[in-house]
Amino acid sequence: MAVPKLDELLIGKKMEPRYMEYNWRDIALYALAVGAKKKDLMYTYEKYLKAIPTYGTIPYWGTVNVKPYQWMPLPASMLADEIIKPTIAFLNMDHEIIWHKPVDPIKGTFQWQDEIVDVYDRGEGKGAVVKTKVLVRDEAGQAVCTNYSTTFFHEAGGFGGKPMPKSDVVIPDRDPDYCEDDYVTETQNLLYRLTGDTNLIHVDPEYAKNMKFDEPIIQGLCSFGFSCRMLVGYLIPGEPERAARMAAQMSSPLLPGTPVQLQVWKSDDHKAYFRFMNKNTGKAVLNRGVFEWK
């Protein structure tokens, strides 16, 4: 049976436009979902409110204001899943967000359109990787941020496509310049779920076991948001609006109720590298991370 040319099938496909409305409560809920503490009133109290920059990742799954676990319409990664079927599972490999302007923390509307921008072939039996782009605009049509992410499909390789490029991020071979400990609570996945990522692997024990996990796991973009909050606190304290770009590989699953550590290496005046570590296992949850600011 011939293997379909996934690059020809998928590259350039765009989804229907989507939108979501939000207000200060959604901004504060997101902050709590990514670990904001009592001292972080800047993210949780409307008197001082600023948005944690990674609130701009919420449209990637985009299930806010719709029925749980239903995308209306499908985001690009899910469309790829529909075309590639039959497939057992797909896995997010990395995420990148570029900020064009700060997120309005009081209220606003996000509008966006998902697009498949590239497909990589890891070889027969090794899977394929689909890269998607989500440009998020506000109600006036101004660009707020651009999300890029890659999704791995286990059974889809061997169609003769180009290989996936290697990351150009190299963590310095020295001790970190800064470390900060934190804790992902036993209900962190449930709290983050309320921000829009209703994938069953993060809530349903039976579903998680079917996917070879002992229990539901923390959302990758929750770890991404945790890291962003901590990076802002160290590198640009009190000024989240200065964030320019953040990217990281999703390297290993994280269970609720786990101590974590952010490790940071400064590169220059406006760039740093980071890892987000599981302190129980010593493994990187997020690796090859980079954070840039204005």
Please tell me what each predicted stretch does:
Residues 19, 40, 49, 55, ...:
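Generic secondary-structure boundary/loop-capping signal
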Residues 43, 126, 238-242:
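Short, surface-exposed helix-loop/turn micro-motifs enriched in polar/charged residues
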